[in-house]
Amino acid sequence: MAFSFKSFFGGADDEEEEYEDSGYEQQPNQGQQQPVNSQQQNTSNQSYSGYNNQNQNRNGFAYDNGYRQQPKMSAVNSSTQSANNSAKIDSHIALFVPKVFSDAKTIVNQLLLHEAVIVNFSAIDETQSAKIVDFVAGAIYAVEGSIEKISDEIWLIAPNNYAVSGSGSAANSMGRNARF
C-alpha cells in the first residue's frame, strides 16, 4: 500500500495545476534586462552601512569590516547601581531664619533646587510665620514634597527626593489651637 499525500489531505480528486517557469534559467533576449536576485546585489562594493570597506578572505568570500564594534555590556546588580548613584548625589539641607515675608521666596528657591530646608521662625511674629508656611505649602504641593513640624518654631521642608520619617507631621499636628 503506497502512501500518498494527495489522498491523505483529500487532494486525490483535485486537478493538477501547472505553473510557469519563472524565467531565471532562460537566456534573456537582447534589450531585456536579466533578473537579478538579492545575493547578486549584495556582492557590490558598497555594504549596508555605507562603507566601502569590503575585503575578501582567503576563500574568496566578501565581508564587510566597516561595522562599529559595540561596547561590551555587563550585568550590574540594580541595588549596587542605585547605591552608587545615591552616593554621587550631593544632598544639602539649608538652615534659614526668616525675618520678613519676602524671605519665603528664598525658602521656595531652595525647595525648587531639590534641597531640604529647616526653617526657624523664632525671629518673626506668628502672623508672618503663618503666611510663610502657607506660601511654602503651595510650593511643596507643586513639587510633591513634604513639610514636618519639628517644634513650635522649627519646620522641616523637603522636596520629593527626600524621605522624611517619624511621627508628628504638620498635617496631623496642626489644629485650631496650633500656633501656625
From Swiss-Prot:
GO terms for biological process: division septum assembly; FtsZ-dependent cytokinesis. It is found in: Cytoplasm. Keywords: Cell cycle, Cell division, Cytoplasm, Septation. Residues 1-66 are annotated as: Disordered. Residues 12-23 have a biased composition (Acidic residues). GO terms for cellular component: cytoplasm. Its main location: cytoplasm. Pfam families: SepF. Residues 24-57 have a biased composition (Low complexity). Homodimer. Interacts with FtsZ. Cell division protein that is part of the divisome complex and is recruited early to the Z-ring. Probably stimulates Z-ring formation, perhaps through the cross-linking of FtsZ protofilaments. Its function overlaps with FtsA. Belongs to the SepF family. HAMAP family: SepF. This is Cell division protein SepF. It comes from Oenococcus oeni (strain ATCC BAA-331 / PSU-1). The gene is sepF.
